[in-house]
């Protein structure tokens, strides 16, 4: 996924009201931009970090600029625009870069399904195998305190919506379709992923139950730069002991 036109650079002053951020430009001016991320963004929104943003030519938008990437003071690259995760996974599937998801004939997005009025991120179909329902989650929370190098967690805040998605995926698996939770690792420092039991215990428990019901968990990491982001490798998923 190439950024075109090229992203522009600034310095983060603050993020506020969840969806807004003030950014200082190199000429000293300050602009307010949209932040497409509902999470806590722990470690992704520290004042003083370098941010890279896109600009829309849509005159109807209240905020023309969108925060896309953070370049931390530790040197990590993070994609904070969660809307990019789904598009990135779709691109990787169509290019055959996710080997577990090859062999399907049709791909749809945002399809209604389930008993809780949900929409699946990606639906794959084939005449020769069951439908494949894929829920994509963006992973950007890096544990830099415990000394376990490269450990990433999801979620970074309590997510009732994410809990609902796990229940829906489990029901799909029980009905005989293929059901997948795909963690898109969008932080250059993360090398492995675990459920954040210390943040959302209910989500962790539901994830374990979903796997027991037949839901598959995949974790793929993206390569990130100011020019492009793309899926490059599979990383490990494992449960962790509760943090004290």
From Swiss-Prot:
Gene3D superfamilies per record: 2.40.50.580, 3.40.1350.60
Gene Ontology MF, one: DNA binding
Listed PANTHER family: SUGAR FERMENTATION STIMULATION PROTEIN A (PTHR30545:SF2)
Family of the protein in this entry: Belongs to the SfsA family.
Descriptive protein name: Sugar fermentation stimulation protein homolog
Organism: Vibrio cholerae serotype O1 (strain ATCC 39541 / Classical Ogawa 395 / O395)
Record gene name: sfsA
């Amino acid at each position: 996924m190439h950024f075109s036109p090229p992203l522009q650079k600034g310095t983060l002053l603050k993020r506020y009201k969840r969806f807004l951020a003030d950014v200082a430009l190199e000429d000293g001016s300050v602009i307010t931009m949209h932040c497409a991320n509902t999470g806590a963004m722990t470690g992704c929104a520290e004042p003083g970090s370098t941010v890279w943003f896109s600009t829309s030519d849509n005159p109807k938008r209240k905020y023309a600029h969108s925060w896309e990437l953070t370049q931390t003071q530790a040197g990590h690259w993070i994609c904070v625009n969660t809307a990019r995760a789904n598009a990135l996974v779709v691109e990787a599937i169509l290019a055959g870069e996710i080997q577990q998801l090859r062999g399907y004939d049709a791909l749809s997005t945002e399809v209604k399904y389930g008993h809780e009025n949900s929409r699946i991120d990606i639906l794959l179909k084939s005449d020769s195998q069951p439908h494949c329902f894929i829920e994509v989650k963006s992973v950007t929370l890096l544990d830099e305190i415990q000394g376990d190098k490269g450990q990433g967690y999801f979620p970074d805040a309590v997510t009732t919506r994410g809990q609902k998605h796990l229940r829906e995926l489990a029901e799909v698996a029980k009905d005989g379709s293929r059901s997948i939770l795909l963690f898109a690792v969008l932080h250059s420092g993360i090398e492995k992923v675990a459920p954040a039991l210390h943040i959302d215990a209910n989500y962790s428990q539901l994830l374990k139950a979903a796997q027991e019901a037949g839901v598959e968990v995949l974790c793929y990491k993206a390569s990130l730069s100011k020019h492009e982001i793309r899926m490059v490798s599979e990383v490990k998923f494992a449960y962790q002991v509760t943090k004290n």
